[in-house]
């Protein structure tokens, strides 16, 4: 089928977005802090963004100085928020804010874990930031991905998938259709992908491959496949012949740049991240602010999000807590290591900096990923998969936690830091100090489990069939992976 068919197919599609009411998450009202950059507060338009969040969640507004984010710690320790949202113009939304925010929010109390679900609201302009704040919940039922194959779109209402390993292939599934159609895209996959974005609204965009703050290569390691770039806040597709096509996809979506270097770094007003927010419809975006080689945060957040258990913001936050758990199992001394926030950091420089402290590739990768992966958007906005995609239903009632397996789920046969993702549970309220997780009927705390004021981690092993139910309680005790 010729690539021109793609244009005719997508031209017939009416714009739509999948919007649904939010399901159970901790209530953000009254436990939300809006942290507004002091310089940004001088703009009336940006002040309106912060005010909208305050009104939405009965939030507390605090101002911070971009030169020292940690300066708001006394206020955070007093308020003990469940959610923290940093509001800033893009000129001050760079890597230093991402790193300092992550490090600051681990210091609200005395355990080594993050103490609030957080995000950064920014954009090419204040209107983009306001769209992050004011929009409806999103129920993710359509997808676009750069990692496609012939079965990628099965189970999705509609979407499209390019293949970063093949210049000539792309798959399209139109709204209302049950069939996936393969499209020939060579020699201009960039134009074909731009046309798909213009014609088919999707809720979820996920990518890998080469990227920087200023471009994304469509076909891995093959410049002839073209790229996406930005110009004056707009996304543009560029072919290898320097032909241009506008990438315009304004419907609200979440973008997870799971395997891309640098595309999550807002290094100024005009960059790839702000272009996705401005003309690409990204009201939430997750991505690396550095080169990525280990991938725990990117692929882990994607996996947790796609489990259906969590919103995108919860997946970002909880995957980071799993990473901190893994660091604690490998080398607790690394919990005190802080990546420099104010200087440009390459992997080589980081390796030299960590000589004598890092012993393994896992320790290096986990420490590198810990504070360098960003979440942009309102952290309390519900962006999640529909109930039918959930693999485990998690219920919390007082000190009791129940896991109901809705599908067959397999975990590694033994606890391993790189492959084990404990089941993460957001708690309704902070449990008493000195408590641990116990399996139903168990007399000893569950090995390697964690309980904090915000969440619990329950490591599981082996296969768990659909229909199985597991029950746990939180009561006095201390596990081998205690928060201390």
Locate the predicted segments by residue.
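Boundary at the C-terminal end of the N-terminal hydrophobic targeting segment
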Residues: 17-22
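Cysteine-dependent hydrolase recognition
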Residues: 23-482
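Sec-dependent N-terminal signal peptides
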Residues: 4-13
């Amino acid at each position: 089928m010729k690539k021109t068919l793609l244009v005719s197919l997508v031209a017939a599609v009416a714009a739509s977005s999948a919007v649904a009411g939010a399901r159970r998450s901790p209530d953000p009202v009254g436990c939300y802090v809006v942290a507004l950059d002091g310089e940004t507060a001088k703009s009336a338009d940006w002040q309106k963004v912060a005010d909208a969040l305050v009104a939405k969640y009965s939030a507390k507004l605090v101002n911070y100085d971009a030169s020292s984010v940690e300066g708001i710690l006394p206020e955070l320790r007093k308020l003990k928020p469940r959610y923290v949202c940093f509001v800033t113009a893009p000129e001050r939304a760079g890597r230093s804010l991402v790193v300092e925010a992550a490090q600051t929010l681990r210091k609200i109390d005395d355990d080594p874990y993050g103490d609030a679900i957080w995000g950064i609201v920014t954009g090419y302009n204040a209107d983009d930031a306001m769209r992050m704040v004011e929009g409806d919940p999103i129920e993710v039922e359509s997808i676009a991905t750069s990692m496609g194959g012939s079965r990628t779109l099965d189970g999705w209402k509609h979407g499209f998938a390019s293949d970063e390993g093949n210049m000539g292939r792309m798959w399209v599934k139109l709204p209302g259709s049950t069939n996936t159609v393969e499209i020939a895209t060579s020699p201009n996959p960039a134009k074909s992908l731009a046309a798909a974005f213009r014609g088919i609204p999707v809720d979820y965009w996920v990518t890998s491959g080469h990227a920087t703050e200023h471009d994304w290569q469509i076909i891995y390691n093959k410049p002839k496949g073209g790229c996406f770039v930005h110009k004056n806040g707009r996304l543009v597709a560029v072919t290898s012949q320097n032909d241009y096509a506008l990438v315009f996809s304004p419907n609200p979506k979440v973008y997870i740049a799971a395997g891309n270097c640098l595309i999550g770094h807002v290094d100024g007003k005009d960059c790839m991240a702000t272009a996705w927010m401005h003309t690409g419809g990204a009201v939430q975006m997750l991505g690396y602010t550095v080169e990525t080689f280990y991938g725990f945060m990117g692929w882990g957040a994607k996996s947790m999000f796609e489990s259906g258990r969590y919103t995108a913001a919860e997946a970002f936050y909880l995957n980071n807590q799993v990473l901190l758990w893994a660091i604690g199992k490998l080398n607790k001394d690394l919990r005190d290591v802080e990546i420099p926030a104010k200087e440009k950091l390459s992997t080589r420089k980081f390796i030299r900096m960590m000589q004598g402290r890092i012993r393994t590739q896992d320790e290096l990768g986990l420490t590198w990923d810990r504070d360098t992966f960003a979440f942009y958007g309102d952290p309390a906005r519900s962006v999640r998969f529909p109930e039918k995609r959930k693999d485990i239903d998690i219920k919390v009632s007082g000190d009791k936690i129940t896991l109901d397996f809705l599908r067959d789920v397999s975990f590694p046969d033994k606890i391993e830091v790189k492959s084990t993702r404990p089941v993460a549970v957001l708690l309704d309220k902070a449990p008493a100090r000195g408590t641990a997780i116990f399996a139903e009927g168990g007399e000893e705390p569950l090995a390697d489990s964690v309980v904090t004021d915000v969440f619990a981690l329950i490591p599981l092993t082996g296969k768990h069939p659909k229909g199985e139910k597991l029950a746990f309680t939180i009561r006095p005790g201390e596990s081998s992976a205690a928060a201390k």
